[in-house]
Amino acid sequence: MQKEKIVVLYGGDSPEREVSLKSGKAVLDSLLNQGYDAVGLDASSKDLVVKLLELNPDKCFIALHGEDGENGRVAALLELLGIKHTGSTMKSCVVTMDKMISKEILMHHRMPTPMAKFLTDRLVEADEISFPVAVKPSSGGSSIATFKVKSLEELENAYQQASKHGEVMIEQWVTGKEITVAIVNNDVYSSVWIEPLNEFYDYESKYSGKSIYHAPSGLCEQKELEVRQLAKKAYDLLGCKGHARVDFIYDDKGDFYIMEINSSPGMTENSLSPKSAAAEGIDFDSFVKSILEQAQC
């Protein structure tokens, strides 16, 4: 039986390029170790379409993060070329990439998520949500240009920094434990509790290697079931497919708040999704294989 040809898409031109390169290398190494006919392709290539047509893969493993991998453009391209790919469809990627659109859908379905809105008139909008608040780009990931703002005096600088990355949203700050749940289609994995290096799980906390991760999270059986059910419902409501990750805050009252859904999570051996799977005895190679097997067009 002829082996499937796999192209791992990584890199790209988003601010998360370096993270994507690490994810792509980890996935490619895993596939090669498992005997797959796999090659890597940097999505920043101006000849991306030509190279994809030349390689003519059976499947593409999307290891892109940020705009290039999560805004639906790459998924749309692969779907038009008839190439099966990991992750969500173009429509779902468009929704999950925009945190405000995602949040509005979740709120419509009465899912627990902090109140938020676009930050257009900074003073008026901030007055409607009591401090502290989170200020961040509506699109993007890795907590780039995300700020905890405690006063009007801090708001201007946060807005200026976040607005470099597109539209800005302001969100009620929720204090509690940071919990995340990885999903691959119908498989909902163990929750992970993150103790960030800094006050919250910002870019430095994510990639400094100094944050502490608890996998499994240590939630009681009832709360573990609750957070998994919430994660799967959010995943389904936003039309996610394949591998995705749902991030929560778990407050001191015992309530979960959905913060965002990531349609193309990190895929190094130290990333959150592999930790979530590892907590259930699934090693990195097996996790990569399970994601690849769910590839669709």
Curated annotation (Swiss-Prot):
GO terms for molecular function: ATP binding; D-alanine-D-alanine ligase activity; metal ion binding. It is found in: Cytoplasm. GO terms for biological process: cell wall organization; peptidoglycan biosynthetic process; regulation of cell shape. Gene3D superfamilies: 3.40.50.20, ATP-grasp fold, A domain, ATP-grasp fold, B domain. GO terms for cellular component: cytoplasm. Mg(2+) 1 binds at D247, E260. PROSITE patterns: ATP_GRASP (PS50975), DALA_DALA_LIGASE_1 (PS00843), DALA_DALA_LIGASE_2 (PS00844). It is an enzyme of class 6 (ligase). Its cofactor is Mg(2+); Mn(2+). This is D-alanine--D-alanine ligase. It comes from Francisella philomiragia subsp. philomiragia (strain ATCC 25017 / CCUG 19701 / FSC 153 / O#319-036). The gene is ddl.
